[in-house]
């Protein structure tokens, strides 16, 4: 587990598939989580209790100690804190292009800090013209020289504060789950909460 600040946790493959493994959740000390059924869209919903909160790609709350979680395997997991609120976002390229980050910023209000977890980095995030056209200011190259997108840069451009980015590529690192590398359904968790 990577815990860069109070109220923020990013799991690794060693922690297990957090989407399915409730015992692994308990090892984190946060057994009850508020979650959403992720759809690669822009919706961010408010949560006041644990459980499923429908189709969305982000959650926000002011409830102290309520763990909000999204699950990723190459997409960005983003945690925003500010003014007694927290938002957790599943930010894939479709969601970033659709405005999920801006919607989360709106839900938090006065954003004080942002953490971006392990995700597919430009070294491995090869994209075609339909994706690159949406991220013109954030293009890069893969290790093999093909066009890629720096999604963390695209997210950072939509934030009111400079994010702390965990600079670990899910596809390159065997200690992370990666849909592009493995094609499995295993997922990392991004968890955020308002500390007590």
Regions found by a protein language model. Name each.
Residues 1-196:
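Active-site microenvironment for binding and transforming phosphate-containing groups
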